[in-house]
Amino acid sequence: MSSVFSGDETAPFFGFLGAAAALVFSCMGAAYGTAKSGVGVASMGVMRPELVMKSIVPVVMAGVLGIYGLIIAVIISTGINPKAKPYFLFDGYAHLSSGLACGLAGLAAGMAIGIVGDAGVRANAQQPKLFVGMILILIFAEALALYGLIVGIILSSRAGQSRAD
């Protein structure tokens, strides 16, 4: 009985592990950022309910991090089709590194957004001039996840370049 698989038998494991890592770690960052900044919004909203909608920005920014992981996971999973073309260890490792780059950057950004969002919305309730500063810090934290997304796209595009087609 022969296998129709061409390439390395273990390579798809690493590719799918990369897709899972991208989604899981990014969603962990998104969940942490949403929860941490959501607690800040809820506690601030008790005293200043008129600021709740203005202070929801960190929660939204944290939620976007999960989408970055989803994008990379879809890119990776569509690139794994061993029956259509050979899938070697280089491809699996490229997809694994792509998923880890995006996922761990999303996790770090989510932690930063959560902490800044929590402290920022509470401080904004006491001193409204701090809103612009909070938004700028949140943008820089979100940029960390964007860097991971960009590197993840570049690394996943490297899969398939280990051989001359």
UniProtKB/Swiss-Prot annotation:
GO MF annotation, one: proton-transporting ATPase activity, rotational mechanism
GO cellular component, one term: proton-transporting V-type ATPase, V0 domain
UniProt site (Essential for proton translocation): E142
InterPro entries on file: ATPase_proteolipid_c-like_dom, ATPase_proteolipid_csu, ATPase_proteolipid_su_C_euk, F/V-ATP_Csub_sf
Keywords attached to this entry: Hydrogen ion transport, Ion transport, Membrane, Transmembrane, Transmembrane helix, Transport, Vacuole
Lumenal face residues: 1-10, 77-95, 156-165
CDD domains on file: ATP-synt_Vo_c_ATP6C_rpt1 (cd18175), ATP-synt_Vo_c_ATP6C_rpt2 (cd18176)
Keyword Transport: yes
Top-rank lineage group of the source organism: Eukaryota
Matching SUPFAM superfamilies: F1F0 ATP synthase subunit C (SSF81333)
Positions of transmembrane segments: 11-33, 56-76, 96-117, 130-155
Signal peptide from the UniProt entry: none
Positions in the Cytoplasmic compartment: 34-55, 118-129
Location(s) in or outside the cell: Vacuole membrane
Membrane topology: Multi-pass membrane protein
Primary localization class, coarse: membrane
NCBIfam families linked: V_ATP_synt_C
Function: Proton-conducting pore forming subunit of the membrane integral V0 complex of vacuolar ATPase. V-ATPase is responsible for acidifying a variety of intracellular compartments in eukaryotic cells.
Family stated for the protein in its record: Belongs to the V-ATPase proteolipid subunit family.
Subunit structure and binding partners: V-ATPase is a heteromultimeric enzyme composed of a peripheral catalytic V1 complex (main components: subunits A, B, C, D, E, and F) attached to an integral membrane V0 proton pore complex (main component: the proteolipid protein; which is present as a hexamer that forms the proton-conducting pore).
Protein name: V-type proton ATPase 16 kDa proteolipid subunit
Source taxonomy: Eukaryota, Viridiplantae, Streptophyta, Embryophyta, Tracheophyta
